[in-house]
Amino acid sequence: MILLHAIYTLWVIILLPLLNAEKFVPKVTEAPIETSFNLVSFDDSNTSIRLDGWGVVWISFDAGENWETVKEIEERIFRFTVDPFHGQERGFAFICESPKFYITDDRGESWRALTIPSSEEYLDGDCFITTHPRNKELLIANCYSYMIDADVLYDPSEIYLSNDGNPFLKLNLPWKRKKTTI
């Protein structure tokens, strides 16, 4: 009797929710695209985003059958990433050599621009954004710039922390610059 009760409980807890879950079925379609530089998809979603050879961001909400440009993104983008910790809804679009980037929290339905207040020497570098695994609003920006000073290559970084992009605060960390002689 206890065994039957345990099996019934297991069925109710594990199998019943799986039977009622919405089915995600990946679909592969062929679409004529001239050039594509970067193609990513959100986790468990039919939404895909790609960059063309000119840095224009295209989005498809139907597994690549139809594509449209993202109107909110005005600049040329050089890299797009899906957040590794919040990949079902969040993505980042980065502008080359700029502290400005775009973020979406709804699989590309809407976009907002954020700017990291990096110092002038970092304007020719790039910033990489990381989020906290449990706190989605916590953004960490690592901005770097390669500078040559008297035949020595410096690879300094500036680290910024933000609560959902408002505002980014610079962290003053006690580390030394990494030097490489040319």
From Swiss-Prot:
Pfam families: Sortilin-Vps10. One of its GO terms (cellular component) is membrane. InterPro entries: Sortilin_N, WD40/YVTN_repeat-like_dom_sf. BNR repeats lie at residues 58-69, 102-113. Keywords: Repeat. The keyword Repeat applies. This is Uncharacterized protein YCR101C. It comes from Saccharomyces cerevisiae (strain ATCC 204508 / S288c). The lineage of its organism: Eukaryota, Fungi, Dikarya, Ascomycota, Saccharomycotina.
